Amino acid sequence: MTAPLPGMEEIEDPAVVREEMISAFEDASKDLASNTSYYDAERRPEAIGVTVPREMQQLLAHVGYPRLYVDSVAERQAVEGFRLGDADEADEELWQWWQANNLDIEAPLGYTDAYVHGRSFITISKPDPQLDLGWDQNVPIIRVEPPTRMHAEIDPRINRVSKAIRVAYDKEGNEIQAATLYTPMETIGWFRADGEWAEWFNVPHGLGVVPVVPLPNRTRLSDLYGTSEITPELRSMTDAAARILMLMQATAELMGVPQRLIFGIKPEEIGVDSETGQTLFDAYLARILAFEDAEGKIQQFSAAELANFTNALDQIAKQVAAYTGLPPQYLSTAADNPASAEAIRAAESRLIKKVERKNLMFGGAWEEAMRIAYRIMKGGDVPPDMLRMETVWRDPSTPTYAAKADAATKLYGNGQGVIPRERARIDMGYSVKEREEMRRWDEEEAAMGLGLLGTMVDADPTVPGSPSPTAPPKPQPAIESSGGDA
């Protein structure tokens, strides 16, 4: 008897596997609440210690370092297309699939979940005319799922998902009311009816691979499931900043205004009820205290200095910048003088390099997802050029429009530089459609004789029906006759 290949083991009882995967999902979800609390800057009383009085705990501040860091990375990631093999432009069909699934909105949210929890997931399925009403049957359904709703097991022998489960909770978020099991050969769905599981659908896709692709925030080769970007050192700095802000507020409440000592007067003269001791007006904050007793004296303590707290917060912000690579101006620790454009780019270099590395990891996941989507919709194996697919990302740096234009102009050099006109337009960030329109305008100008022959009006394979005009023949020198006319 031949043993099954790794990742292709037969599932005898899907219901048993469903229960095992739901249990694994619940175990993997235990630590997600802590990640969420840091990202959402929720109150965490355990972060301020047991010696702090209960009344003082109300002053605990919400510190948003984790959200600032995660959002600063995720907001710089934007997919612009998928290029196949040696193609010059992005593939139009794959981009239509991307747009039809609203992935320009959903994908960045998936990146945020991957940074907060260490992972998120991409699911691919073929539309069902009975279930997916109103959906284009020629477009695959591609969804991004958070780890709070999905779990996948990765087989280390093949470094690929062996099975996955997606769950849906009830309105209260207490009980799972639906589950979908993804296997290499079929996708099975269940829902709860009267407390019992009932089969919802069964799709035998026969792909040989699980139609689930993880988006792991990996930091090492051995890290198959991903690691949260909210690292222990970032958590400790967040808690320290919350404690310092709490102490600063308490100090401002108690000693921020100078304390006064008054001698030789009756309490009634400054508005204190002799029976209850209740202050009738706020003598603590009053600027002028007047009383009739000539023997009365008043003295004042110095107000508490809060500079030590602000200095401590500045040091914590510098530690956060060192751990995360965030530019100082993101943490409000920059100098009063505005930085130059070169200084800003230099400060962002670590952040940009981090985003570029994340783009490579997530780009590989999207390429695998698109290959699975192609197999689901077209059948058979993927063509060779799809094996060399490349995800096209927007430039994660932040050059100004004028700086990009200046660089592109100098590199193009009016046709004499190191890059052609089309490369300059790509560097400027124009989309595929915009560049096609520009090429058509170039052709129109060439037809009117505006001097662009031989540059952009040559045959362009990326523009269907592009004309191939030829330059007018050069004038030939006149041929002198050897003899005179009779």
From Swiss-Prot:
Where it sits in the cell: the answer is: Virion
Keywords of this entry: Capsid protein, Viral capsid assembly, Viral genome ejection through host cell envelope, Viral genome packaging, Viral long flexible tail ejection system, Viral penetration into host cytoplasm, Viral release from host cell, Virion, Virus entry into host cell
Its BP terms in the Gene Ontology are: symbiont genome ejection through host cell envelope, long flexible tail mechanism
Q: Where is the composition biased (Pro residues)?
A: 464-476
Provide the primary localization: virion
Query: Which cellular component terms (GO) are annotated to the entry?
Result: viral capsid
Do the record's keywords include tRNA-binding? no
* Top-level taxonomic group: Viruses
Pfam families to which the protein is assigned, alphabetical: SPP1_portal
Span list, region Disordered: 456-486
Q: What does this protein do?
A: Forms the portal vertex of the capsid. This portal plays critical roles in head assembly, genome packaging, neck/tail attachment, and genome ejection. The portal protein multimerizes as a single ring-shaped homododecamer arranged around a central channel. Binds to the terminase subunits to form the packaging machine.
* Sequence similarity: Belongs to the SPP1-like portal protein family.
Q: How does it assemble?
A: Homododecamer.
Q: What is this protein called?
A: Portal protein
Gene name, Swiss-Prot/TrEMBL: 14
